[in-house]
């Protein structure tokens, strides 16, 4: 008994032997949603740019800070806070020294502020420096200097010293040397950005660059240490910073300490 042949056209359609037919139909249905999504993202970027005093879209800042909380450093936090620091410190930001990794980025951001001169100290060897960073190093604006040793500057060379992600990697033994030296080169004060205890860090990146994981300490630990070192919190700067931050709805993802300079 002969078998009745099936409908080849039906089998062809059911077996999905035309792989692009379904995808083309699906693409035609999803393309309006894709277009709407692109318009929404573009609008967010434009709105963020319009309302950001720093020149970096708020949306992008939010994205970067979220990444920072998931395992990156506080250096981007320091960059984001620069306009707020300018409001809080005013003329005390005429000559600024930044100390910490990726200092070229921070110095470049400081240069965009009116009436601000900036210098930077990179505590670690700079790998794959871009053209801008190489230029800053050639001009002597940025230096590579192990902060366990004295900085190559005279006393009170700068109005303000901003430190990010540099002290988190030092033991108390080296902090005893480094923190007083940072205060030595400042005439008006120090601003320290430090990670919160329990904050996630990119372990592989940390070990390859810094040689050790960060020692993330509590605010109470830092305040006790500042007192032992003879440094006092700058209450006036703290109040002005908090007021400026509130106006911009700025909520830092790192600890920020404002210290008075030695007198």
Tell what function each PLM region has:
Residues 148-161:
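A short acidic, Gly/Pro-enriched loop at the edge of an enzyme's catalytic core
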Residues 166, 182, 195:
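Hydrophobic adenine-recognition pocket in adenosine-nucleotide-binding enzymes
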Residues 238-263:
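Core SAM-dependent methyltransferase catalytic element
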Residues 3, 9, 13-95:
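Class I SAM-dependent methyltransferase Rossmann-like catalytic core
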Residues 186-200:
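Conserved beta-strand signature within the Rossmann-like core of class I S-adenosyl-L-methionine
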Residues 159-173:
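A short SAM/SAH-binding and catalytic strip from SAM-dependent methyltransferases
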Residues 206, 211-237, 255:
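Short alpha-helix
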Residues 91-150:
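Class I SAM-dependent methyltransferase SAM/SAH-binding core
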């Amino acid at each position: 008994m002969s078998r009745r042949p099936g409908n080849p056209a039906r089998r062809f359609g059911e077996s999905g032997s035309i792989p692009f037919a379904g995808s083309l139909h699906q693409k035609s249905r999803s393309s309006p949603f894709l277009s709407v999504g692109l318009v929404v993202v573009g609008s967010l970027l434009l709105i963020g740019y319009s309302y950001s005093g720093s020149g970096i879209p708020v949306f992008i800042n939010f994205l970067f800070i979220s990444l920072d909380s998931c395992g990156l450093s506080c250096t981007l936090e320091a960059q984001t806070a620069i306009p707020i620091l300018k409001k809080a410190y005013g003329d005390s930001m005429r000559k600024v020294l930044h100390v910490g990794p990726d200092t070229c980025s921070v110095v470049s951001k400081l240069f965009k502020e009116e009436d601000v001169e900036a210098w930077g100290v990179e505590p670690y060897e700079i790998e794959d420096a871009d053209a801008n960073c190489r230029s800053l190093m050639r001009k002597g604006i940025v230096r590579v200097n192990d902060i366990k040793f004295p900085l190559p500057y005279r006393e009170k060379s700068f109005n303000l010293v901003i430190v990010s992600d540099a002290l988190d990697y030092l033991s108390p033994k080296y902090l005893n040397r480094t923190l007083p030296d940072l205060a030595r080169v400042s005439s008006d004060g120090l601003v320290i950005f430090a990670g919160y205890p329990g904050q996630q860090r990119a372990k592989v990146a940390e070990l390859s660059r810094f040689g050790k994981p960060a020692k993330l300490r509590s605010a109470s630990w830092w305040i006790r240490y500042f007192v032992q070192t003879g440094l006092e919190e700058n209450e006036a700067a703290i109040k002005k910073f908090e007021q400026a931050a509130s106006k911009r709805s700025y909520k830092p993802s790192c600890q920020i300490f404002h210290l008075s300079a030695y007198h």
